[in-house]
């Protein structure tokens, strides 16, 4: 049986919010079967919980924000991408502020934290959402699509008319049956344009952003001294973001996501459209792991 997974131990980290610039204390904790990923604002009294589900998404400007009434948690996508990539079904994410810390701008530090905590298999089958037919949403020239696929695959294309992007790969397709999320996707960092940063800061966004936690591009070049981690790091980061956004289905996916210039808003619209079209998907479990089109790394012993 492919089982649900949680963390073996509690683990903590500290960072700053990309948009708020605030110091944030993050604690990841194990959670019981069928809990899902639940964010908890421990700085509030009483503590407010928000489940990581598509229907709880509020703002999608520059990041994905979960809301419960007037309480929010910003920038959840990189942590959720790490949870998805490592197959974590159930966890509590405790935060001392309204935003998940940006760390280095990728999912890599969250992968390290989760692997350091160790993974624990649980006594219940893991539930997958299997795509049965194509579902597409369009906004202008942007497009996001689910299609049936016996596994999990994410294809993405970006289209930036800019010197830095013209010479680099702007499309990628990652089939996770043959490609490691940890090695090939998790370290891709978020990116931004120098020309946009002043405007964003005037809107109280990107207050914590720097070359320490993002790829920064001016009119001609990448400003980070160390350059890029992957030749196709820009589009790989969009794949990383999409994996985090897709995990707001509440379950791992069997199917392919295709994005063309898609972002957090369109990704969320695709999830909501899929959920409404109940003939387009089914929930499945696998009693025999050998029959599953998706496999996960064996649980890692806590470091």
Swiss-Prot record:
Pfam families: LpxC (PF03331). It catalyses: a UDP-3-O-[(3R)-3-hydroxyacyl]-N-acetyl-alpha-D-glucosamine + H2O = a UDP-3-O-[(3R)-3-hydroxyacyl]-alpha-D-glucosamine + acetate. The active site is at 264 (proton donor). One of its GO terms (cellular component) is membrane. Zn(2+) binds at residues 78, 237, 241. It is an enzyme of class 3 (hydrolase). Keywords: Hydrolase, Lipid A biosynthesis, Lipid biosynthesis, Lipid metabolism, Metal-binding, Zinc. Catalyzes the hydrolysis of UDP-3-O-myristoyl-N-acetylglucosamine to form UDP-3-O-myristoylglucosamine and acetate, the committed step in lipid A biosynthesis. Belongs to the LpxC family. PANTHER family: UDP-3-O-ACYL-N-ACETYLGLUCOSAMINE DEACETYLASE 1, MITOCHONDRIAL-RELATED. NCBIfam families: lpxC. This is UDP-3-O-acyl-N-acetylglucosamine deacetylase.
